[in-house]
């Protein structure tokens, strides 16, 4: 698990601090400094002067490198199609990283208990604060990658591969739907509603729902995608079982914004809550969250469903999103004929339900 990085020469320079560099393809002709400026102008919302200053500092720091990791100069000339790389400081560098709990270790892979404070992979403003970077630093292995993803606020079982030669065999388990995923969730909606009866403990559900996600949208949409559109879509299916009900908290007056499921934000009003066991038969962005919200059981602490909260809404309230990847079950690639079952400890919010 502590194996050091051994990248093949000529493919990609080593990561720095667990963070991979950004790759570019040279169009040829101009100096490398001008090429990088032009390519960053298409990617960053900065002025020409700011980008020029950024590029100058990157060259001075040795952050622009060849595939072998050799620092390149501003006046370097590359042939069309040649690759070069840029090491960028993470926007959240210096953030405290929790120690990851290893739940299972197999041939070329581990399963960790993902905390809610980390994204799965480095992306956007969550770079250092990602499981991949945290694991690379904790185990001293820059080859670690995630075989699948969990939403940033979701906790629980996450499978990581440790070596490129094992990566495909684990990712294919997910692609071929050979991994059984079981989640715990806590939702509102236990009181029922005008159009439905209150769910009973032990009652099972088979939720089937078309959904799609438009580019740039934070939340998925329910229904068929617009005709002719090229958005990601799915005919989702989720099996649900009501494991228990939580004691009804003291009633309070409902505030403006009724429907808010996060106790730390305006509009939250207590009602009977449910503890669910969920098994997704398909895999789509926010599938479990969007499905339960659509059918009247929004997850406690969800900032997106059924309503999208403002970007500056506080996240440090308790409980946060009540969704936990409780268990992974899959055939062990390292031991043919053997099934691996990995279970993550139940979170605090899942305790206390009456069954």
Predicted regions and their residues:
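RNA pseudouridine synthases
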Residues: 1-355
